[in-house]
Amino acid sequence: MTNLHRLGATNLHIAPLVLGGNVFGWNLDRAASFAVLDAFVAGGGTMIDTADVYSAWAPGNKGGESETLIGEWLRASGKRDQVQIATKVGMLEGPNGEKLAPAHIAASAEASLKRLGIERIDLYFAHQDDDSVPQEDVLAAFGKLIDAGKVGALGASKFHAARLKSANDAARAHGLPHYHVLQPEYNLISRHSFEGQLQDYCVEHNIGVVPFFGLANGFLTGKYRSAADFGKSATRGTRMAPYLEGKGPTVLAALDKVATETGATLAQISLAWLAAQPGVTAPIASATSPAQVEELLGSMALTLTPDQLTALDVAGA
């Protein structure tokens, strides 16, 4: 049975790996999405992360496709009580460019609830910061959703340390709900935007961290080791070039060494390293097949030694 971890100061207890929902309705059709979701729950996973904007970037899409497929799966599987649903507002803008305007938050939440076919969003994220709206107004809008029973807990995504602190300071001053979860970009390659002030703030204030891009767009799987490998993925291959520059090859070499020592895959090791970092409750990773889900879930049982963690730290520094 999977050991669940409390997510910051929320009442959510989650498995130490979160399933990313950005592939549903983009890389994956309905049947493939259902297969991945079934495998995730069967393997002990609990939290599914999506957003209203997923996957507006795909030709013919307008946003909401991922939520719609997850909602269809929830109805077909009857597994609503086995999972926690996290979604986001703020990237799929309103008709006048609204991001976190109170009316847009309210309307977006209703649309997400309808697509998901649920009565409450377990964890609702501000998908990005919006300095055009006073932070207390944003939090008051979220507070109304919590009071109405439509949202369980709040999170912030892509916030800098100063803005996360000022938001929670405003919450304290005005008696409003806090951001108890942070979703930053963080992995062995991309570390400096989280490590330091932001990580320290999260640890000090018990803010649960669920990093996205935990596998650096797939680079940390070891699948892309040269430009010749870029063709292995039509959607991700073109994003690999920056990772091959600088410390990328050094990180892969360090992962290879740990893989030899443990028998684990590079993806499992990368996620286990992430899960071991201060403040991190569970990394987020997406999968395109049940086999990938099984591999990723294997990271939950992998404990790296202090020497292995140090070697990876040094390689990715």
Predicted regions and their residues:
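N-terminal small/glycine-rich loop or linker at the start of catalytic domains
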Residues: 8-25, 84-96, 120, 125
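Active-site groove signature of glycoside hydrolases
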Residues: 113-132
